């Protein structure tokens, strides 16, 4: 047998020198805070790479969007079918301050609403709030049986659907355009707009399961830190200088 270098033995030694670095050792944990319009403020935790050189951790966090169940934010299982989007606008210490970014229904809830023998009516409205947030609201409604109705189906005529849709857009426009984004959020949680639509369309055709199924944020105004801190119930730091009143004494030179 020829004596020579055994290639198989030398191959195994290369991997021993490599050290595996845990990627989580370079990351920091930040708390995500929801606005004060919701009952539960602590949304959860998020990870980000630590600030190194020109890469700032705060810049990586700003703009992150979190999708949270409204049931967790309100501590109420009745809101489990609605999802709220929260966007990180500011980082203070280890806290990420978020703002409302949108609302949506779970797909299983939407599928459960659509049934036979009834008409589905949808409407969408683009509206601007008083604090210059441009939103698009999508509403959904279904017809229901009139009292003492024997007929199985509850199909509405085209003229009735148009009248209901017109009423829906008017109510959404009125309710959303007359308030700020935070005030609109407080209206969306208990479904004030849906109940208002249901009540006002009784004369045209009785409705059921009337919801604002989706809210889409199209455009935000220029970022205002003071407004965000007020939304989170935190006092703003006063950066303006105070007027200092001091007696002015003119120095007189005795010798020139």
Curated annotation (Swiss-Prot):
Basic residues bias: start-end ranges: 1-18
Residue positions where N-acetylalanine is found in the record: 2
GO cellular component terms, semicolon-separated: cytosolic small ribosomal subunit
One MF annotation (Gene Ontology) recorded for this entry: structural constituent of ribosome
Predominant location category: cytoplasm
Keyword annotations from UniProtKB, A to Z: Acetylation, Cytoplasm, Ribonucleoprotein, Ribosomal protein
Region annotated Disordered, chain positions: 1-20
Compartments (UniProt record): Cytoplasm
GO BP terms, alphabetized: translation
InterPro entries: Ribosomal_eS1, Ribosomal_eS1_CS, Ribosomal_eS1_euk
Family recorded in the similarity comment: Belongs to the eukaryotic ribosomal protein eS1 family.
Subunit structure: Component of the small ribosomal subunit. Mature ribosomes consist of a small (40S) and a large (60S) subunit. The 40S subunit contains about 33 different proteins and 1 molecule of RNA (18S). The 60S subunit contains about 49 different proteins and 3 molecules of RNA (25S, 5.8S and 5S).
UniProt cross-references to PANTHER family, sorted A to Z: 40S RIBOSOMAL PROTEIN S3A
HAMAP family, per the entry: Ribosomal_eS1_euk (MF_03122)
Protein name, entry field: Small ribosomal subunit protein eS1
Annotated organism of origin: Talaromyces stipitatus (strain ATCC 10500 / CBS 375.48 / QM 6759 / NRRL 1006)
Gene for this chain: rps1
């Amino acid at each position: 047998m020829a004596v020579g270098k055994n290639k198989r033995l030398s191959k195994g030694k290369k991997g021993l020198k490599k050290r595996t670095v845990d990627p989580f050792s370079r990351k920091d944990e930040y708390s995500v805070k929801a606005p004060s319009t919701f009952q539960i403020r602590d949304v959860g935790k998020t990870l980000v790479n630590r600030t190194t050189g020109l890469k700032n951790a705060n810049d990586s966090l700003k703009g992150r969007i979190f999708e949270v169940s409204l049931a967790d934010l309100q501590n109420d299982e009745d809101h489990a079918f609605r999802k709220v989007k929260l966007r990180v606008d500011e980082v203070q210490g280890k806290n990420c301050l978020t703002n409302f970014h949108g609302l949506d229904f779970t797909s299983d809830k939407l599928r459960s609403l659509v049934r036979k023998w009834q008409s589905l009516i949808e409407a969408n409205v683009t509206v601007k709030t008083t604090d210059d947030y441009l939103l698009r609201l999508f509403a959904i409604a279904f017809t229901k049986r009139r009292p003492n109705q024997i007929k199985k189906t509850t199909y509405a005529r085209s003229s009735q659907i148009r009248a209901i849709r017109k009423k829906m857009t008017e109510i959404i426009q009125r309710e959303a355009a007359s308030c700020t984004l935070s005030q609109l959020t407080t209206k969306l949680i208990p479904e004030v707009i849906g109940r208002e639509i249901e009540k006002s369309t009784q004369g045209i055709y009785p409705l059921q399961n009337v919801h604002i199924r989706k809210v889409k944020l199209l455009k935000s105004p220029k970022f205002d830190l003071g407004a965000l801190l007020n939304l989170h119930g935190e006092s703003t730091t006063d950066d303006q200088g105070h007027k200092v009143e001091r007696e002015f004494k003119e120095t007189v030179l005795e010798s020139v």
